[in-house]
């Protein structure tokens, strides 16, 4: 007899198998017990028929408690009524680990309670579906960039150089000097691009933002590619192909998790249609002003959540907003060739109210200009001498971008809050568990 995972049930219809599971819920009548089971690969139902098993087995099926771990042995059958499509007719049950008074009962619980018990809430069907999709997006990320000829270059987490200033950085001591937890691997990826052409990093980043919005985490994961000999328009093409690839990979490989979440796949299919619209910051301001909904919006300010939502919904798919004012963007962006007041950059805004999921730009290549911008940003040039060296020794046009994984997961899954998109969210008021 074979031991299998639930996800492999379709390959063993009408076969007797053994599966290691946890009990998520149960109900029973006088003659039949229905056990909702999970094993980390999928969820399905176990059916225990009183007349088909021993008295001890049926009694155990009725008494076993939520989240008890079990080995169940039985025959796999098709179950067209369920999302999963299969169930097991149980013949034997073996208790592996008891579970008494499991705190997360099937009733409704508040957000704070579930966050306090996040280590257990991860076992829920909804969290299972979200993490399956997150995992698929990570897998697809590596696949996409490997196919495109990128190599992964790991950027340090501890750094003495800040890409966007130090006001939102976590400070620590590095023996006898200051250091910070990284808020971006971009500067190091630029060094990698000058060595290897096309590189990307994927790792945790930290922002000490005192923000409580549904879009912000203190610790999150970023995908940051950098490309040598590449201008902004070529970078935009890679960005949209990458995002469409993520969406298509989820559609192809996560039908079951999407069904669990009730995500509209027809909407997701629309996001695979390229190219995505492109508008300038100037045009975005004009659209907002003409809408009559944003009387206070004016040129020179960054967009907030309502403005980003309106712009993306206007196009019903991801949209690039290009060439933002220089004053509201970081020092490393390349100035526009015909305008002193804007830089060559773009944010990708996701529809359905999710806002910015990518920020990118063509990078400045003139070392004198960069040094001036570093000083204007209130940073110490000595900390960036290595970065300026990249312009002094064989500089080339190069571009890059960063995609926040959790924002993208939240968007693709259709969840309301970014805290659901990471296993253990770090929020302004939460660092436990």
Swiss-Prot record:
The gene is asnS. GO terms for molecular function: asparagine-tRNA ligase activity; ATP binding; catalytic activity, acting on a protein; nucleic acid binding; transferase activity. It comes from the Bacteria. It is found in: Cytoplasm. This is Asparagine--tRNA ligase. Keywords: Aminoacyl-tRNA synthetase, ATP-binding, Cytoplasm, Ligase, Nucleotide-binding, Protein biosynthesis. One of its GO terms (biological process) is asparaginyl-tRNA aminoacylation. Belongs to the class-II aminoacyl-tRNA synthetase family.
